[in-house]
Amino acid sequence: VGDKNQAIYGFRGADSNSIGMFEKRLKNGSREISHFPLTTTWRCPKSVVSEANRYVADYHAHEDAPEGNVIVRAAFTPLRNDMVLCRYNAPLVSAFYDLISQGKSAYILGRDMTAGLVNAVKKITSNNHMGTEEFWQLFMADFEFNHAKLISQDKVNQALALEDKKECIAIFTDKATTVGGIISEIKRVFDNNDEGEIMLSTVHKAKGLEADNVYI
């Protein structure tokens, strides 16, 4: 089940043309193909669907859906049970620190981020006492090498994912004085058992979830 508009895992190699490729290969194998359009959303209000139609056609709200409200450039004032979505992780980390500084309870969905970020730090050094300035110089040299390699191989989505990881680690580096401190900050932000009043999440992790108020 899927369509050309659902390649939300592009950073993992998802292809928006995957369904088309399946269809082509099945037809070449003399298989009969049937299409069953799923163009009605039972989850989104009409105003949200109307906004989505600017980018995705043939997508409709259920006739009983509430009208809802889309506010462009709304003030960032999320409250309890609100959801904050972003395509990448780094802006979520910044938003997390911003909300915490305001005394609000927030969490970033996806504890699986912890291992990847910690490993990216440990890949550079196992010395937890190393200062952040020295660490950052070594980290950036490694980043630039691997980023250039991905670009040369035309792996754009993977390069963007690497950029996002770099931006995340940059934020944590600014919050610490040593490598050990960076790792502690990563674990503090992501190892909170997904508990809090305001949920921050990347779009792909939030698939299937809903909230009355969503900031994008």
Task: Report the location of each language-model feature.
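Short, intrinsically disordered/low-complexity patches at protein termini
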Residues: 72-74, 131
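Short amphipathic beta-strand/extended segments with alternating polar/hydrophobic composition
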Residues: 74-76, 169
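Terminal export/targeting leaders at protein ends
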Residues: 78-80
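Core RecA-like ATPase module of SF1/SF2 helicases and allied nucleic-acid translocases
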Residues: 86-216
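Conserved helicase motor core of SF1/SF2 NTP-dependent helicases
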Residues: 1-72, 83-102, 107-119, 195-199, ...
